[in-house]
Amino acid sequence: CAGLYNTIGNYNNFFGTASGRFNTTGCRNNFFGPSAGLCNTTGSYNNFFGSCAGCNNITGSSNNFIGQDAGLCATGGNWNNFIGSGAGLCNTTGSLNNFFGLSAGSRNTTGSNNNFFGNSAGSNNTTGSYNTFIGAYAGSSNTTGSYNTFIGLRAGLCNTTGSNNFFAGRCAGYNNTTGNYNFFAGACAGFYNTTGSHNTFIGACAGYKNTTGSNNFFVGCYAGACNTTGSHNNFFGLGAGSCNTTGSNNTFIGSNAGRNNTIGIANNFIGAYAGFCNTSGSNNNFFGPSAGTYNTTGSNNFFAGFCAGACNTTGCHNTFIGFCAGYRNTIGSNNFFAGFCAGFCNTTGTNNLFFGCNSGVGTFGLANITTESNRIIMGNCLHACAQIQVAWTAVSDIRDKCIFGSVPHGRGFLQKINPVKFAFKDRNTGCLTDIVGKYRYGFSAQEILAVEGDKPVIASNEDPDKLQLTSDYLVPVLVNAIKELSAELDALKERVASLELKS
């Protein structure tokens, strides 16, 4: 029965039971196998090899179907190449398709310009067009999605109507269903993405758990791996933002930068391990390796420099600039530290301003600030002098003061303290820290404390290991002493005048 009804069809080769049976005018066809090209009538330039290959083709031309049931239901589609058992099985009028592999594109009906390579690749595609699926089960659930490129074992396996996607790598974009305009490259990249769109995930498991998050850019192995609904994020580097779930508008650049961020938003972490432990802290900017490493919920911080603010956990509104600046700060807030290791030892101190290398740090001279607040420290214990072009001006408006009485000290107080000539030394070694031959004039804080008593004002014992005094507070005492001396002088003048009258 091969070519049984052929009338004027020329240059045909029909081999096998019922092959080309109903061909009438079709020309230059090659049908090999039982029922191959069975229903072909006017279709020409076709090559059908295999049992029932192209069995239902009627008018389709320039097709190549190789394998059992390959192109079985094709009727009028043209320029198709189906190779493999069941490849293009349900294709009807779809044209310009290339399906290679067992059941590749088996349910395609009218979809055109598709390329499916691999076992069951694009097997459920119906009307989707301009797709390229390469790898076993790649895009196997795609139905109407178009302009997709899936490369790798099970890449884009669950995609149904999602379009304009590029998935490359084993199981890349595996669960994507309707997500559009995504680019996933790497094994399991964007594995759980379903409807998330406009994402770019590059690297093994990059964006692995992303579901509906959109407009994300993750580059690096495990970058943004746990992101689910977070959007508008940029993560670059191994494990960068890997634990982020719903946090959005973040930029993490560097190995493990912002790794533990979950819901924090609007953060910028640049440098390996920068913001590593941040979870919900938001509006932070950490620049430098390990900057803000242990920050968890602290927000509105700016750390720039290697390990700057590394130990900060919940401290907020801090600005640390310099190598290890604010290194030990944990919950201290509203601080500004600028300089190499500035404020290094501060832990809970708040509202401090430290300027200069090692400012607020040291075992001698300037205090080693840890928990103190509301301090302004400029420089360190090695600075020999402070210079300014004009005098300091302090607020002294009576309207801003609550008066508690007059200064109780005067000449008697001054007589009990002794000015000393000195130079600073390292308390531990006894070595001078001042320039050799340079001396200073001042007082002993211990001596002034002893004279002031229980409620000191001029001297401070807030830190028993770093006694301090405010020399300006001696000015009112000097004024009182001058007044006392002036009164005594006036009394003496009156007495002298009285004695002169008597004489």
For the regions a language model picked out, list residue spans one by one.
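Extended alpha-helical scaffolds used as interaction platforms
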Residues: 7, 13-15, 30-32, 47-49, ...
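Acidic, glycine-rich loop-and-strand cores that form catalytic or ligand-binding grooves
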Residues: 410-426, 431
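Conserved SAM-binding site of S-adenosyl-L-methionine-dependent methyltransferases, i.e.
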Residues: 2-4, 9, 19-21, 26, ...
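C-terminal accessory segments
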Residues: 403-417, 439-451
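Active-site and glycan-interaction determinants of carbohydrate-active enzymes
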Residues: 445-464
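C-terminal intramolecular chaperone/auto-processing assembly modules
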Residues: 459-503
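Glycine-rich, low-complexity segments
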Residues: 5, 22, 294, 382-406, ...
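Small/polar residue-rich beta-strand/coil "junction" motifs that cap repeat-based extracellular fibers
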Residues: 220, 254, 334-410, 415
